[in-house]
Each structure stands twice: as C-alpha cells, then as structure tokens.
Swiss-Prot record:
In the N-terminal section; belongs to the type-I 3-dehydroquinase family. In the C-terminal section; belongs to the shikimate dehydrogenase family. Pathway: Metabolic intermediate biosynthesis; chorismate biosynthesis; chorismate from D-erythrose 4-phosphate and phosphoenolpyruvate: step 3/7; Metabolic intermediate biosynthesis; chorismate biosynthesis; chorismate from D-erythrose 4-phosphate and phosphoenolpyruvate: step 4/7. Bifunctional enzyme that catalyzes two sequential steps of the aromatic amino acids biosynthetic pathway. In the first reaction, the AroD domain catalyzes the cis-dehydration of 3-dehydroquinate (DHQ) and introduces the first double bond of the aromatic ring to yield 3-dehydroshikimate; in the second reaction, the AroE domain catalyzes the reversible NADPH linked reduction of 3-dehydroshikimate (DHSA) to yield shikimate (SA). The gene is aroE. This is Shikimate biosynthesis protein AroDE. Shikimate binds at residues 226-228, 298, 313, 442. The keyword Phosphoprotein does not apply. The keyword NADP applies. PANTHER family: 3-DEHYDROQUINATE DEHYDRATASE. Residues 1-208 are annotated as: 3-dehydroquinate dehydratase. The active site is at 110 (proton donor/acceptor), 133 (schiff-base intermediate with substrate), 277 (proton acceptor). It catalyses: 3-dehydroquinate = 3-dehydroshikimate + H2O; shikimate + NADP(+) = 3-dehydroshikimate + NADPH + H(+). One of its GO terms (biological process) is amino acid biosynthetic process. 3-dehydroquinate binds at residues 21, 29-31, 55-57, 171, 196.
Length: 478
C-alpha cells in the first residue's frame, strides 16, 4: 500500500499535501512530531485521509512518561494505524490495544546503522503488534541487496526500507519485496526520511504494476552518468512489462558478493557499464559469442539462476554508423581508449574492412587491443599526427583529449552531450555523432535479449527521441 507522509508543518500545508495526493494514494502517515497543528486540526486532517497512520518520533529530551501520554492521546483520535517505536514500553502498548482494539499497531525501528533485520525481527516479534517496520542504513549496493534478501524470508506484515541515497532502490522494489507499506512524500514536498521518493517518482518506476512476481532490471558500475532509468522505465511501461529498471552503483571489489546475491533475487537483466565490462567476465556462467570475441560484456541475462553475458556495444555503434551512412570500407578509423566499450567497438569494426588505429593513455593497453583486432596502436598524444576519416572517442568526459579533427567524430558518452573535444571538432567542420545514439541502439539490443518474445518496433522511435531530449538537458561540457 502506497502511503504518503504528511509533514506540513502548518495545517494549510498539510491539507494541501493530502489533497494533492488523494488521486494517487489513499493511505496517509501523519508525522505528528513535524506538524504544528492543534488536536482539532489533526482530526480534520484525518477526516480527509481515507486511511490514516499516526506517528510521533520521540525527541531525546522527552521523558518516558510524556511519551506514553502522547501516544495514548493519539490513540484516542482513533486512527487506522498507530506507529509505536521499538522502545515504547510493551505493557503500555498492550494497554492501548485493550482500550482501542480497532487500531492496528505498527512496531517500528529507525536506525542509521546497518542492522541484521532477521535478528531484530526475532527480538521484536514477541511484541503484540500487527505490523513491523524496519528503516535501516545500507552503505553499499551489496549491503542493500543483502537486506532485500533478508526481507524475503520475513513475514508479509514486515516493511523494510533502506535509508539514504544508497537505499533508494529498496523503495522502488517495495512492492516486489511485499512490503505492506511503501512510504512516499507528497509531490512537491521535501523528503521526511533520507532518500524518500515522491509519489510521482514511485509511479515513474511503474509502482502500480509491480508485485512479488515482477522481475528486476538494473544498471551496475559507475551509474552517475547514465540516463537509463529515465528512458527504460517509461519504455517498460509502454511495453506493458511490470519491471523496474534501477541504478545500482557497484565497484569491482563488490562483484563476488553481487553475483552470489543476484542469483537469489528476481533479476532478469542487468546493464553493465564502466569500469565493470571486463571485470564481470570471471563471474559469468556462459559467454555469448559477442563476449568471447570482444572480451567485454555490457549485458547480463539471468534465467533460472544462470547468468549469461552478452555484448551489444559494438553492434549498437555499428548500427548508428550505418544509419548515418558513414563509409567504413577501406577507411582509416581512430578509436580513442582501450576499455570495455573500445574493445567491443574495435572487435565489431575489425570485420568492416577498415584500418583501425587504437590511441590510449597507456600505450600497452592499446597494443593489447590492437593485437586482437589487426589494428595499430599509438599513444594518445599521437592522435593529431594521423589523418583518419572517423574518430570514435571511448574515454570518459573527465579525460583530456588532444585536439583532432576528422570528417566524422563520434563520442560514445551520453552525458554531457557536448565535450571540449566534440566542441572543437565541430568548430573545425567535423560532423558529430553524439553518445545518446549508440546508447539507444545498444539498449534496444539488450531489450531483445531480456524480452525475446515481445515486439516493440512501434515504440523504438519514441524511445530514441526521449533519449535525445534527455541528453540535451545535460549538454554542458565539464
């Protein structure tokens, strides 16, 4: 059940928050500790809410006697639910239950620490509560996934949410985790808890269609420069797929735990971005021919616990070049970089009868890639010395690239759309192909791997157009 947290602080602001949310949600958590309202005004707010939860977070300066009196007075307002913190005296909770048997009790714990929620639940379940809520901290994606895994072994009357920015995916996955309550803020209001989404955000991630049977798709790696969550979720919604696409920041050091965890979670597909495209290879159960050829993997397909790696980067860029009618036969093509994406692109173009030149900051890495693609290797500083018909930049925006021009320049970075490198090339008359074009083509290839039985040709133009618009919003060079 989607629940909007009402924080006011004034009566008028609280009323607006409720009225603004009524079409999207019917349950409202009144954070009485944040509201500056009278008892009569609180009653009026409750009358507006079809379902009400009253919660009052105990200040450190509050005595236990005053705390008990406060919660008893809130119970007398007859809410549908009353949230009592973990340390609220058990005997006083029982007294409230006896006096107000119609009220459902939520026993809650909020902590900024990473906690074993199974042990916590074992300790708290002796309490005569109807529901249990655990709001805990996660310091990493693997922590988050571990907590989600723990939640799946708890009864359906438990709500588990991870706080902060790292915990945001747990809020999106709430229906899949079978949380009885999913807490959100009214659209336009400030978050009450760290990482709290607005109602609008939850519906953007297809909240209404998600259930315990829904699969999960995600992006792993350095997710900071991706627009995938902004393009993929609307696409899945249009496709009628009850599946969220979430961003999971991940480092190479976290890969062993990540791969052991996703086998126990309902993951269907994973996009892999830098710096993990080669690091994931040892953890794959199967490698598609595209991965064996390039030595790079940007796509995971998970079926029945088996993880198969695919590579759609090279084919995605090749498709873009064909759409722009860029000649490759007997042409000299410069590839800047030697990482996963560069490997994929070089491998694909090595079959296009063109001469490949690999330029990289570390020349040894360029030489290694060149030896596998019948190419020539150079240091990055040598780029301006060579005349080529096409330059493909695969280095991140933070890298300084020597000024160079060619009839056509490709930058595979999606955001920012413009870089110092492409701006200079454009000023010298080069035709520029921006990263969002490769992004959409490689993503469409991923979708075909994840949803092989679905047809979505009719949605591709809208998907491509959306990516182009979003890339333009992040168009300023660093």
């Amino acid at each position: 059940m989607l629940c909007t947290t009402i924080s006011g602080p004034s009566f008028l602001e609280a009323k607006k928050q409720i009225l603004r949310s009524l079409k999207e949600c019917h349950c409202f958590e009144m954070r009485v500790d944040l509201l500056s309202v009278s008892c009569l005004e609180l009653k009026k707010l409750m009358e507006l809410a079809p379902i009400s939860i009253l919660a009052w977070k105990k200040p450190e300066s509050c005595s236990q006697a005053d705390w008990i009196d406060k919660m008893q007075s809130l119970a007398e307002l007859n809410p549908n639910y009353l949230d009592l913190e973990k340390d609220f005296p058990e005997e006083d909770m029982i007294r409230i239950r006896q006096l107000h048997p119609q009220i459902k009790i939520i026993r809650s714990l909020h902590t900024s620490e990473h906690t074993d929620i199974i042990q916590l639940y074992a300790h708290m379940r002796s309490s005569a509560a109807d529901y249990y809520k655990f709001a805990v901290s996660s310091s990493s994606t693997t922590d988050l996934l571990d907590i989600c895994h723990q939640k799946r072994s708890l009864p359906e009357n438990t709500t588990v949410v991870c706080l902060g920015g790292m915990g945001r995916p747990s809020r999106i996955l709430s229906p899949i985790l079978q949380n009885p309550f999913t807490y959100a803020r009214s659209t336009g209001s400030s978050p009450v808890a760290p990482g709290q989404f607005s109602l609008k955000h939850h519906y953007f991630y297809n909240f209404a269609s998600l259930s315990a049977q829904s699969p999960i798709c995600a992006l792993i790696g350095d997710t900071s420069r991706s627009i995938g969550h902004l393009t993929h979720n609307p696409f899945f919604s249009q496709l009628g797929v009850a599946c969220p696409y979430i961003k999971l920041p991940l480092t190479p050091q976290e890969l062993p735990k990540f791969f052991s965890t996703i086998r126990t979670q309902p993951f269907l597909g994973v996009s892999v971005t830098s710096p993990l495209k080669t690091a994931v290879l040892p953890f794959l159960d199967k490698q598609a021919p595209s991965v064996k050829a390039s030595g790079s993997c940007n796509t995971l397909v998970i079926r029945q616990g088996e993880i198969e790696g695919h590579d759609t980067d090279g084919e995605g860029l090749f498709s873009v070049l064909m759409q722009h009618q860029i000649p490759l036969n007997n042409q000299r093509v410069a590839i800047i970089g030697a990482g996963g994406a560069a490997q994929s692109i070089a491998t694909r173009l090595s079959r296009a009868n063109c001469e490949l030149l690999i330029f990289n900051r570390t020349k040894a890495h360029a030489e290694d890639l060149a030896s596998r693609c019948q190419a020539k290797a150079f240091s990055l500083e040598e780029l301006p010395l060579h005349r080529v018909s096409l330059i493909i930049n695969c280095l991140p925006p933070s890298c300084t690239i020597p000024k160079a021009v060619a009839p056509c320049v490709v930058d595979i970075n999606t955001i920012p759309k413009h870089s110092t490198f492409t701006q200079y090339a454009r000023s010298q008359g080069s035709s520029i192909i921006y990263g969002h074009e490769m992004f959409t083509q490689q993503a469409l290839l991923q979708f075909r791997l994840w949803f092989p039985t679905l047809s979505f040709k009719h949605l591709e133009k809208t998907f491509i157009r959306r990516a182009a618009v979003l890339a333009s919003l992040f168009s300023i060079a660093p």
